Amino acid sequence: MAKEKRILDLEKTIKKHQDLYYNAQPEISDAEFDALWDELKALDPQNKLFFTVPLESTEGFAKSEHIIPMGSQEKAADPPSFEAWALKMPFKEYIVQYKMDGASLELQYEEGHFVRAVTRGDGKIGDDITENVLKMKGLIKDITVNAGPAYGTKPFSGGIRCEVIMLRSIHQKYFKDKANCRNAANGLMKKKNGELCEHLNLFAYDAVQGSIGRPFTGDAPFKTESEKLVWLKKAGFNCVEVKYCKSIAEVIEYRAHVMDIRPSLDYDIDGLVIKNDTIDPEDMKRARPEKQIAFKFSLEEAVTVLKEIEWSESGATYTPIALIEPVRLAGTTVKRASLANPNIIKALNLKIGSRVVVTKRGEIIPKIEALAENPPNVKEIEYPDTCSVCGSPLTNEGTRLYCPNMSCPKLIHHRIEKWISVLDIRDFGITLIKRLFEMGRVNSITDLYTLTVEELAAIDRMGKLSAEKVYKALHSKKEISLTEFIAGFDIEGIGETMVEKLEEAGFNDLNELLGASEADFANVYQFGQVLSHTLVTNLSILKDEMTGLIDKGYIKIKPPLTSEEGAVLKGLSFCFTGELNTMKRAQAEALVKEKGGTVKSSVVKGLSYLVTNTPDSGSSKNKKAQELGTAIITEEAFLNLIGKV
């Protein structure tokens, strides 16, 4: 009886909050609503609420039918949930779009001419707000781009699905009295006279050819989802961001990236929409399509006060850390929050004394996501202006604050530590590196390879056996990948993931990298002007040491894998923990490298998979993987991944 009562209570509560949400008066956060939803799903997976669309309607507007029902989406709140869904799907590559946090709308066209705009409503029938939409930015009244000879030449007839968005900059300038951009957009789009609708923007994310009652009929100017998105842009629509991912791990990595840059966007997003490139009409007709999913940003948030900024030093970089009034988040007391870089401080207009929204999604240090308000007594944030070690003036590029002196002892010491870490030289600890650096014996990566067993043995508390072990560990990592080689030089912003993106773009050789220009790098995904300049500048400075390591025979860069079969794990990283059943751990690690992947000795941010035969254990690696959202798979799943089962 208790279970049935709880189900009824949840149904009632969810219906109430759905109505409030879709009519611009939410009383609880998205995270709180998702928790209710997930609890009901666990108790009653076939509950009718999962197969109906909540009502969104306003009196005073004419009603109109959708060309195709505007259903709800399956949801994944974390990487394991997304992976569980993805493994059930018949496709292994994904189209990933921003899930914009606004109000859904269908724009209807007849032979290229805009005829009406219909709100979500109950998913089948919504409010006709055509007059209001005519005042919004981003509306295309006449679609002049035709299908072309490959599909026929008739102008488009069908529905364009959009999100009505209020930009954050507009909200801050004109509508601060509204709780957030979504509430403001929902309120304005349903004003009877369309007043102030010029402050709203339309972003297109989907299209369906046909007419009311006859979806997917007639000529379509696209055959796949990717062609559809290209066509929408050609037609002139503002479109949501899109990324094409070739693996589950790449989707998870991209989600982490978007969560990091989310505060700097001028619009609100609350997740990603994942789908296949193949258009499936029958699936799209469902109230809850099975072959697409909303991969949500799992957050817990609270409002608190920014008390002070502490500047954390790592290598040459100075990173702002917010010291905040203690607040409870995810069962812990939070006193510090990450701000990533100076640009975030500027974008959010943060001051000492600001009331801020702090979120936690598993990281050790939570993040400041938004400004709640700036009270009258706030103070400007002060930035350090000189290096604490060498005294050089710091450079502030917005995305980073750093010491530009390439001879700064702190930078050199950090680079040597990074080299040892990236190459995973396990017996060469940071204490030994520090002692060698302080002795003046090691001042570059090259110096590491001139060390002798006798020199190492002479160091206090070392001894010959330990010295031989360290020497062997260092020289056993002679043949390494280009990714490891470049990432090991600790160039700001150029970690293993970014080097892999360079390789994917065709930079498979050290000489190609050394000879490339800023413009060449700027064409690579996620490489903007600043990062491209940083890379070219550092490669120029480090060129002699890089080529020297190779010319002297200390390091050999492995040639890139050429066949798709051989590089099946390219771009993926693995960490193994616990006992394996079919092979030794060293054999599994060798398999990963043979297939183009990389191996990590510990769970770190950006790791693709933790492989363990006890995924439910409370081990430190399992806990860390869960905190970082890293996919945890069994040995059997790993073997499936590399085609060994």
UniProtKB/Swiss-Prot annotation:
Ligand binding (NAD(+)): D30, A31, E32, F33, D34, S72, Q73, R120, E163, K275, K296
Keywords tagged on the record: DNA damage, DNA repair, DNA replication, Ligase, Magnesium, Manganese, Metal-binding, NAD, Zinc
Entry's Gene Ontology molecular function annotations: DNA ligase (NAD+) activity; metal ion binding
Signal peptide: none
InterPro entries named among the record's database cross-references: BRCT_dom, BRCT_dom_sf, DNA_ligase, DNA_ligase_AS, DNAligase_adenylation, DNAligase_N, NA-bd_OB-fold, NAD_DNA_ligase_OB
Residue numbers binding Zn(2+): C387, C390, C403, C408
GO biological process: DNA repair; DNA replication
Coiled coil location: none
EC number, as in UniProt: 6.5.1.2
Pfam families per UniProt: BRCT, DNA_ligase_aden, DNA_ligase_OB
Superkingdom: Bacteria
SMART domains, sorted: BRCT, LIGANc
Function: DNA ligase that catalyzes the formation of phosphodiester linkages between 5'-phosphoryl and 3'-hydroxyl groups in double-stranded DNA using NAD as a coenzyme and as the energy source for the reaction. It is essential for DNA replication and repair of damaged DNA.
Protein name: DNA ligase
Lineage summary: Bacteria, Pseudomonadati, Spirochaetota, Spirochaetia, Spirochaetales
Gene coding for it: ligA
